[in-house]
């Protein structure tokens, strides 16, 4: 089993069996697994980030109102379907995980309308690994009781990223 297949299997198990999953009891009873795109090696990138030295703290709106504070950490640029795309990577605290909330051409059609998230990994030689096969829906995609950061306008791209989680049926 590939790393991605194992990751998805573990996530499906968590969603279907764990009472801490974002699914309601009723949703868990009907759960047969999340919907995913097939694995795409073309949507895995090792990128050199442009680090932002001014440590700008920003407020990102939440799906339930209000906002959450985070920091713009770096800018990444990559080629996708013949288009140069630029996205901002965020970090809540120094040394904390890197977070990429984004909205793309699939949002609202093939994937959750508000957008998806990607946890960006550090790679060798000051590069970042962005593997969109691991892109995931925020918990509020499954249950309105969750509050989720909304991808900011700077992370909304027109290109379609057909990798990671797809839209989830509304079983509320």
Language model features: what each stretch is:
Residues 54-63, 67-72, 89, 127, ...:
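Extracellular/lumen-exposed scaffold segments
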Residues 104-136:
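Acidic, glycine-rich flexible loop segments
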Residues 136-172:
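Extended, aromatic/histidine-rich regions of cofactor-dependent oxidoreductases associated
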Residues 41, 72-74, 96-98, 114-116, ...:
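A generic structural signal for short beta-strands and their flanking turns/coil linkers
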Residues 1-55:
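N-terminal domain-onset segments
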Residues 62-113:
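Mid-length scaffold segments of soluble, non-membrane domains
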Residues 37, 43-51, 61, 79, ...:
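Conserved, single-site charged/polar hotspot
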């Amino acid at each position: 089993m590939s790393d991605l297949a194992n990751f998805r299997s573990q996530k499906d198990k968590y969603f279907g069996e764990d009472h801490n999953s974002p699914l309601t009891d009723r949703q868990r009873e009907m759960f047969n697994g999340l919907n995913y795109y097939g694995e795409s090696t073309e949507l895995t990138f090792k990128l050199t980030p442009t680090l932002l030295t001014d440590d700008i703290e920003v407020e990102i709106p939440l799906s339930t109102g209000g906002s959450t504070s985070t920091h713009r950490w770096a800018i990444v640029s990559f080629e996708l379907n013949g288009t140069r795309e630029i996205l901002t990577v965020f970090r809540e605290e120094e040394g904390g995980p890197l977070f990429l909330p984004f909205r793309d051409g699939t949002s609202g059609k093939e994937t959750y309308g508000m957008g998806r998230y990607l946890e960006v990994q550090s790679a060798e030689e000051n590069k970042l690994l962005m593997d969109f096969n691991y892109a995931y829906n925020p918990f509020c995609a499954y249950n309105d009781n969750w509050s989720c950061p909304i991808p900011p306008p700077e992370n909304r791209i027109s290109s379609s990223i057909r990798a990671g989680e797809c839209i989830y049926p509304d079983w509320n």
